[in-house]
Structures are given as C-alpha cells and as structure tokens.
C-alpha cells in the first residue's frame, strides 16, 4: 500500500527530486507495507527502511551485534524521517493529497533554493537530533533488549550530532552526517541481517495497520513530532534538501535493490537523507496533526468505558487495563511500533523536560516556533501554515495524548503490578494494543530518550544514568512483569509518571472506587438502621413460646362404689398443656405444623399403645388362660395366611401406599384438625413397634389405598394391614365392608394381636373371647386360616397400621361401619390376639376404651366380653357384646361382598362369614345393639369428623354411633342403600330425619353405609348377615330380611342409577362422610375455583337471573297493560304475527287458534285478543293463587336439583304419597279456584287484579313462577325470551286445547262455589306442579 501510495504521490508530483524521494521512500514504506518485502533496499534507504520495519517490529527484532545497533542508531535518523515522510505522504495522500503535493513542492523548492539549505541544514541538525532520537528510539527499541551499550554508543554519536544541530552550523551537520554514515556502515552489515530477519517477517505479518493509507496511526508522526517540537522547521527544510539529494542518488540503488550503502555513498546519502528527513519532517508536521487527531479519536474510542473492541471473558475485563509488555503477537507489535512514535514524542518530551537542561527544553519550544516560522518562509507558505497548524495541534494533541497515556500508564502500572505475568501483559496488549504499544514503545524509547536528551544537550551519561535509576525504580516495582523490556517500559513509564507528579505509590485494585459509580439512592445510615432494629426488638419482643405446663383439671368421674353402685366423684386430672409456639416462629415450612403434630401424636400413641398393651396383656392372661393355646395355633395359621396374602399384596400395597401417602398427606393437610390427630394416632400406633410400625404403615397405606380403590375391601395386601382389616371389625368397618360378625371377629383378632401377647396369649385371648362369644370361639378355631393380620403388626402396630391405612383412604368411609365394627371389636377386645389392635382401637376407641386405642383402662376392659361389660359399665360404656350384636346384625351383608372384592376366594366368603360373625348370634347376644350403635356411632362421628382422638374420645363417639345405629337399625338397609346410591352419607340425625321423611328410604348411617357397601359387594354377605341375625334375634332377622329385600331391590335400582349417573364413583370418597363434613371446605377449595372466581361467577349468574326476572316482569307487565299489538312494538317488524307463528301450540298464543297466524289481520285477531285477555286474566289469577304452592314445590325441586338421584327419587316417592292423600281435595279446590278466577278475570279484569293485588305487589319468586308458567310449553325453556323457538307437535297442542276446553266446560259451573285461592294455597304443595292449569283456561 505504501509503495502504491508513493507511486500515486509521484504521479501527482512531477518534481524529479520528489519522485526520487518517493521512489526511495516507496520501498522503505513497503517495509511497513503489508504486501511488499523489505528485503533488498537501497543503501541509503535500506537503513532507514530497516529501522522503519524495526520500529514496527521493535519487540521482535533481535540485535545480532552491537554494530548492528550502531547502524540502526545511525540510520534511524534518516529512517525515521524517511518513514515519517512516507507515512506523511501516505497519510496525506489518503486524507490530504493537496498537502502532500505542497509538501513535495516544498521539498523540491528546498532542494532548488540552496540558500535555504543552510537553514534546512540547521533545521536538519535540529531535527537530526529528533531523527537520531527517533532512529535511536527505533533502533534502540529494536535493539533495546539485546544491547543497551550499543544504544549508548549511538546516543553518544547522536549527542555530538545534536550539539552540532544546536549550533545550527553546517559544519556540525556535516560532521554529524559523517558520524552517522560511519554508524550506518557499521549498521549496514547488521541491517542486511535484520532485513532478512525483520523486514520480511514484518511484511508477512500482513497487518493492515502497517498500511498507512488505510490506517493513519500517526505513531511515527508522533515519534517525529516531539523532535519537531524540539527542533524548528528550519532543520526540517534542511533535511528536506539533503533528502532530496539523497533520493536522487538513491534512486538507482533503490530500483536495483542492491544495498550499496556500505560502498561509500553513505556520506552523500547522509546529506540526502537529512534533506529527505527534513522534507519528511515537514510532511510529518502536516501528517502528525491528522494522525494524532485520528490517534486521539482512536484513543478516546479505546478509553471509552463503553467501547468493547471484542467479546471478552470476565478475566479479560479484569486484565484490560495493564499495558502489554514488549512481547506480543504481530498485530500488537505492529500497533505498538506504529503508536510508538506518539509515545516516543511523549517520552522525549517528558525526558527532555526532566533530564534535559532548560536550554534543551527551551530549544524544543524554539524549534517548534522556529519550525513554524521557517515553514512560513518556505516557498509554499501554505505548507508552512499547515505545518504550523499541525505542529501546534500536534503539540496540543501530544499534550492530550501524553496526559491520556500517563493516565493509561498509571493504570497500566497498577494493573501490571497486579498482574505482572507476561501472559496478562500480552492479553492486555491485545485488549489495549494502542495504549500498551505506546507504552512499550515509550519504554523502548525511554532509554533512548533519556540518552538522547543528554546526548543532544551534551549533559553526559549522567542524565541517562538518572533515567536508568528512575527506570530501575519502576523496574523494581514492575518486576512482576515477566520480561526485561516491559520492565524498562514500566520503569520509564513510572519515571515519567513521577516526573509528571503522578503518585506511583497508589496500588491498583480490581474493586471500583466509591466515586466510580453514581448512586442515586441516598446512602443508608447503617447505624440508624441497626438502632431501628434494636428498638423494634425492644418494642416488639418476640413472644416466647409457652413451655409445656401441667394443669390440674377438676373432673367428675363416674365410679363404681364398693356396693356396686355408680357414683359421681370429683377427681383431679393433671393435664399437660402442649408448649404453645408462635405461629410464625416455630412453623416456617408449609407442612411443618402438621408434621410436628404427627410426630407428637405418634409419640403419644406409642405411649398409649404400650400402656394399653400391657393392660390388655394382663387382662388376656387373666381371662384367656385356657384359650390361649388353641387361639395361638389359630392365630399362627391366620398370621401365616395373612403373611402370605400380605406378602403377595405387599408390593401392590407399597405402590399403593406411595400414592396413598401422598393422598394422606393431602388429606392430612386438609384435615389438619381432628383428622390429622386421628391419622397421627393411627400412624403412631403403626409406629409403636418399629418393625410393626413399618409393616403397619405399609399395610395401612396399602389397605387404605386398596380400600379406596376397591371400595374399602379389606384384602390383606400387607400381612398386617389385610389381616387387621379382616380380623378386626374396626378395620373392616373402616373399610366399610366387614359384616358385623366379621368385624367382631376381626376386632377380637385385632385385640389379640394389638395386645402383642405371645401367640399363646393372643390365642388364649381369642379362645376366651370366643368362649364368651361362641361366634368368636368358632372364629378362633375355624377362621384363623384366614386372618392375614400379621401378629407382628397386630400385636404392636397392626391395629393402628390398619387404622392408618384406613384413615388415609377416607375417614368417612369408616363412619358407620367402622364405628359399628370398632364398637363390636372393642366389645370383643378379648380378641386382642388379632394383630389389628391398633386399627381396632382407633375405630372402636369411642365405643370401648378397652379397644386398643382406648386408654390403658379401656384396653383392659376390652379383653373379654365379660370384662368388657364390667369395664364398660365402670367406664360408662355399654357392653361390647351388645355392640357386637347390633353390629353383627348390620354387618352380615357387607362382609361377603367386601371379602370378594378383596380378592377373597369363594371359600373366603364362608371364612368371612365365620370371621365376621356368622357366629354372630353369640356376639350379638352378648352385645346389645344399643351399645353397638352407641359405640359405633361415636366412632363414626370421630372418624367422620376426622377426629381420631384418644381411644377414650373415640369410645364415646362409637357408643353414640351405636345408639344412632340402634335408632336407625330399622331403616339401616334402606338408609345404606340410599346413602350409597345417592353417594351422600348423611349424619345419623340426617338419616333419622330422612327416615322419618321418606319412611323406608332412610339414608343409612355411616356404619350402615359401609354395611350397605358390603351388601352391594355381595348379596351373599347380606344373606349371611341375615343368617347371623337369625342366630342372634330371629325377629330382628325377619325384620331385617324384609328390609334387606327392599334394600336390595332399592339398592339394585340405586346402584344401576348410580352407575348411570356416576354417583357411585364418588361413593368411596363419600365414605369419609362425617369426616368430610369437617374438612369439606378444604376439599371444596381444592375442587372449586378461587373465591374471586366464584364471586364473579355468582355475580354473573345473579345478574343473568336478575335480567331474566326483569325481562319476565316486563313481559308480564306488557301482556297485562299493553295492547296485544304493542307487546313487541319495541322491535321493528316484531309484530304479534311473528310472535304467534313461533310460539308453540301449547304456548300462550295457542290459546288463540293456530289459524290466527294467517287470520291475524281478520276477525280471529279480535277473537284471539279477547280470548287471550280472558285467559291471561284467568291464568294470572290462578298463578297468584298457586304461586305459593308452586313456588314451594318448585323450590323443593330446585333444591333437590340434580345433585342426587336418590333425593329426586325420594322426593318423587314422598310426592306421590302426598298426592294420593291430598290430590283429590287439592285438585277440586284448585279447579274451583281456577275456574272462579278465570271468570272473575274475564268480567272485571282490572277489579280482579286489584283484589288479588297487582303483579307489582307479587314477590320476585312469584313473578318468576308466573313468567315460567306463562310459557305453556312445559318442555320449553323457562326463559320466556326463548319462547319463539318452542316447538310442540300440533297434534298434541290441539289435543291439549280440546282437553282443556272440555275440562273447563265440565268444571265451569263450580267456579263460583270454589273457595278463594288464598285459603287453598296450603292444601297442595306438590300437585300444583304435576297438574296443568291451562286445561281450565279455555272454555
């Protein structure tokens, strides 16, 4: 590029001298050019070109010898000037061709006008110094790493030359040139080597920055600029003349490419070079301004904080500021060499200012001013002006650059101190190539500058020494930098910074200063904030959690006196209040409170179970001494079977347990109240024995999951859980499928196992219980084969495990059945040998504290029926035997089906019958149904409410449930069927109320619900239950069988309906029944949308209904008060004709003849209008009369809605029954009132309205009914606005007309005698809906 530029400039400039210069320069520039090789340069230019290339490749140039350095130092004068000239030419050509031409003209004139040669030579001397300096800078920068001594020699030579320049005498200049020629001769040898080593590799670098046309770096301009400042333009002109001469001589040598520099032309070349350098300096003066301005622009761009030359890593950003060391890649070296000139200028300025005498410093200013003046005296004053401007601007630019560079050097030093590694410096070189290269060049030039000033000033090496010392100090500081040249660079930089007054002691740091960021927010006063916090703590002291307290509570206890009478005694019970923790403090996690509650419950249950087991074991030992051996064997068989079954189902249960555990967690969170407690009790019982707990948890989870999935089938999915479910009536009741007998057996078994007596003890207990209850004895002997409850689980945790399993399925499922089973099992806690004691106790706890869950005292009583009866009396509970009897009657139907669903074999049904109390006759005899119901109801209440409270609490609940069961025992089958079919498991009160309301259709209590579930599962189970009832009470069995038959029929019907409606699907969840009631809101919250959404929906619905009501009212008012034609006048084209067409035959318009559509404009219209008014009056009157009745019935229907088919069915049944009783008188009265009203309406329509009150006075509900009734099509939508689309078959409409006419005619005579509708309202609440009034409307 430079060569091309030179040629182009040559074309522009016709002066042969200039051409020769250009030609000579073009190769030299080519040294910097990317495409030309610097290889064989002419003698004169070869040195300069070499040094130019060396400048660019300062860092990589290796000095072969001191002589080479000398040559390098000698030639750099010319080299600097030549390169600067060429650079200026190129830059000016690229940006300022006119200036280049002027410069060349000036050079030519300087050649021609030899008179100015003296001035030029003087200026040359002045600028030979800068040239020497630049050459030394370039040469030393090149050879700096290799030899400082050689640089010193060059400096001394240059010092002599500089002194001559100061004198501004030609003689000195010539001597200087001679010396330089000598140096060049020595250098020439090195130059050749360097040309081979440096020039071509430099060209190979292909750096575009070398191309000055493309990149006007102004680096070399800057190198010369300080010299220019130091030396006037006169020297530049002299140098231009010499260089022009030089180029003339050089042209052939350059063209030939032969280096004849050694051959003696060096002297003349020196002069020529001086001239060239002077001319080049004059060009550089112009070029510097441009290049430095561009450099300033580049620097500003580089230094801009937001300028990011390339994507860098965070490490690069950290390393950004440090200046590159002399080592670097080709690009970095090229840039550094280019930017070196500016740094050289700055360094020379600083070094001269500090090290040079004031003479030299003033001399630089004189040079600058003189250069400006001499430029003015040039043949081309324009060029001189430009140079003046350039030099002045260059100085200013240099000052700015010096400042910027100094700042950058400081930062670089800081960062270099931080990161002394050369790798970092290289990275920094890449990042801040310009700054880094400048500094490296500064460093390289540093020594040169330090020497040059003192050479120029003749100060001797003291200044260089000082400079060296100064450099050494920064070197020590910058020892971290890996390479010597960088150290020197840093030395010089630090030296310069010190000279500039910069505090070098400041250590760099990665963190930004406080002032580096603009913080708009006011500074926070930390002390004040801390004070506020302390004050807040004092003002609002954290409420300390209340420690656990023991409070004595006065309790009235029923106690048995020594004489056997019950007495109420005052007792003091110590109650330990749980430590009260702050809500926010202790419970930070979502489920933490629940977990803590669970843990506490488990601990409490462990203690309670342990105590109860001990009591039970003692009771078992006392009561079941004889029976333990037999029952132990039976229990072993049962446990084996249960284990086998459990093992088979353990895997399934484990999977199900995982799901159930999640469900349980959700349920527990929902039920966090009582249900959580109950679940925790169950879980705690499960946990009592770790092994048992684990098994129980698995079993319970599996069983509960299975129960949910299978409808609470108590399949022994896990050894303990299945066995507990089947063996323990409580578990079966929880599952909701065990018959009462089966439940009692399971309860006995559960009692045996929970007691955790040895198998002998548990067996003996079973045998004893069975002896007390023959059914249980049979169970012990025959059923043990199927009692999958694991003894391990049963003894320690089986009962609770099952309870835990069951609780998770859905506590409501176990309401009635669980209560009944629990009560039975509790009644027969003598069964403790069964492993399900925990589940048994959980569900039977309320009926009998003796059950496993009951307190220790309760458990003691549960051991045997006899002991239980006594204990129950002492505790105030009914005998467990009675509970069992009640339960056994209820349960027989459920167990079979449940067992079948539980994957029981066909033989298992028999086993279930036996286990469930097909031997229930004895159990039932022992346990009156009343106690059963009480206990079961209590248990159910507890379970349903989600309260798995202490066994004591569960016991009263079960007893209450037993009472309820007894009360509802008559309607149990129907209630169960209804409840199951409808999917609603109402409370016992609801059941009783429904029983009263619906008679046979009673909603079964939860126990009965489970029984009904069992019945649903298998009719055979019901039959077995019936058989058991026969054993217990044949009368009761007969009653039950009848009820069961009805129930089964009803159940089949309801089941079919449920299957169709899908209500059966939710039955399992609905088994939760009463428990669901407790946390029903939570469940609803899960299903329903948010309150806002609900509110918005309700508002929409309300507004819609209001709008419909308004529309209905408006239509009624229109019909009443507006003429027939005006009714739809609001819509254009919406004539009565249209209305008549689209209305059904049974609609209001049907009152008018269908033909009225065609004849509306004719006479029929009048007739129809009259008839319409008449009918409307009659209809309104009748509606007023029937508004209340219709309203009531409609509201009932609406209330029933589509929620449950069972409710609809029950309503229908009751409605039919009521209609049978009251339909005739109601019909008569209605007809009378209707007939009366129409006639009255016809004659005095307005008077009639006044009598009955206007529609405005009617309540909104009545108006709605009226609007609905006004639509005669019963199948049509209620909204009158849709009447247009009602369709009735014309035949039906006609038939309806005829029938209505005939009926009206028949009953016409009785109009006057009918009582007023007001009195008739109360008579009929249902028939009004079923009967159509419109048959009376047409006469």
Curated annotation (Swiss-Prot):
Chain span(s) of sequence motif PCNA-interacting protein (PIP): 311-318
Protein name: Claspin
CKB motif repeats: 910-919, 939-948, 976-985
Consequence recorded when altering residue 1085 to A: Does not affect cleavage by caspase-7 (CASP7)
Residues with PTM Phosphothreonine: 916
Consequence of substituting residue 439 to R: In a breast cancer sample; somatic mutation
Purpose: Required for checkpoint mediated cell cycle arrest in response to inhibition of DNA replication or to DNA damage induced by both ionizing and UV irradiation. Adapter protein which binds to BRCA1 and the checkpoint kinase CHEK1 and facilitates the ATR-dependent phosphorylation of both proteins. Also required to maintain normal rates of replication fork progression during unperturbed DNA replication. Binds directly to DNA, with particular affinity for branched or forked molecules and interacts with multiple protein components of the replisome such as the MCM2-7 complex and TIMELESS.
Stretches of the chain forming a coiled coil according to its record: 162-196, 592-681
Region Disordered, residue ranges: 1-96, 136-204, 243-285, 336-490, 618-707, 730-774, 946-973, 985-1075, 1294-1327
Reported modifications of this chain: Phosphorylated. Undergoes ATR-dependent phosphorylation by CHEK1 during activation of DNA replication or damage checkpoints. Phosphorylation by CSNK1G1/CK1 promotes CHEK1 binding. Phosphorylated by CDC7 during DNA replication, phosphorylation inhibits interaction between the acidic patch and N-terminal segments leading to increased binding to DNA and PCNA.
Residue ranges of the region described as Acidic patch: 988-1086
Residues carrying Phosphoserine: 26, 42, 46, 53, 65, 67, 83, 110, 113, 225, 260, 516, 718, 720, 723, 731, 744, 762, 808, 810, 833, 839, 846, 950, 954, 958, 1012, 1018, 1020, 1156, 1289
Cellular compartments per GO CC: Golgi apparatus; nucleoplasm; nucleus
Comp. bias intervals (Acidic residues): 465-475, 625-674, 989-998, 1008-1017, 1066-1075
GO molecular function, one term: DNA secondary structure binding
Biased composition (Polar residues): 72-82, 385-394, 423-438, 764-774, 947-961
Primary residence: nucleus
Site, as annotated: Cleavage: 1072-1073
Domain remark in the UniProt entry: The C-terminus of the protein contains 3 potential CHEK1-binding motifs (CKB motifs). Potential phosphorylation sites within CKB motif 1 and CKB motif 2 are required for interaction with CHEK1. The acidic patch region is required for normal DNA replication. Interacts with the N-terminal segments and inhibits binding to DNA and PCNA. Mediates the interaction with the kinase CDC7 as well as some replisome factors and DNA polymerases.
Gene induction: Expression peaks at S/G2 phases of the cell cycle.
Quaternary context: Interacts (phosphorylation-dependent) with CHEK1; regulates CLSPN function in checkpoint for DNA damage and replication. Interacts with ATR and RAD9A and these interactions are slightly reduced during checkpoint activation. Interacts with BRCA1 and this interaction increases during checkpoint activation. Interacts with TIMELESS; the interaction is required for leading-strand replication. Associates with the MCM2-7 complex and other replisome factors. Interacts (via the acidic patch) with CDC7; the interaction is required for phosphorylation of MCM proteins and CLASPIN by CDC7.
Localisation: Nucleus
PANTHER family per UniProt: CLASPIN
